[in-house]
Amino acid sequence: MITRKEMTRMLLKEGLLSCLANHSFESVTVTLLCKASGITRSTFYLHYSNIMEIVDDLVDDAIAYSKPGMVDNNNLQTIANTLSAASNSVSLREAYDSIFDRLPLCQRIIRHKKYLPLFLDEQISEYVLQRIIGREKDRQGLVIAESLGISFDVGVSVFVFLVHGLYAVNKQYKWSQSDEWLEAQKIIFELVYRGLQSR
């Protein structure tokens, strides 16, 4: 059974997502958030000291929803080869779905549209990306380092580059996972994999 505390936090998180659909993060005040959530300011301050704490909770929820992905030394190769084998948009979508658990966390999170407002707002999107990078960098950096024979720190740098690049492409396509977007994903993963292979 859900506790009152959990219910209140859930209402505030849903309220913030609702506010972000119509307002910039910068313009969301505690008063506006409380009105959208149907709770009082004093109740807000019993659970959070500021709105960024709700953003943190939402990112944590999105990460938990997305579940840990499959990561191994052949991850990039598996993704690139699976997508490359697709001959048309239908088989490409099927290929993408088949390797979905291997995709970087930033790609898996956006599949759940509920969390999309966190990525759409210019003021908090970089903060959200940094939280995602912080959660994944040790695991992803190590895999990249081992597969390329480079230092862990350089592996993390490659991972950060990939996350920001994929974010930029998602933003360019306005977060719609269209056939054209999917083709771009295929080319990006092929390009990165081939580039790393030539090293």
Stretches found by the model and what they are:
Residues 1-23, 30-32, 36, 40-199:
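Alpha-helical bundle regulatory/interaction domains
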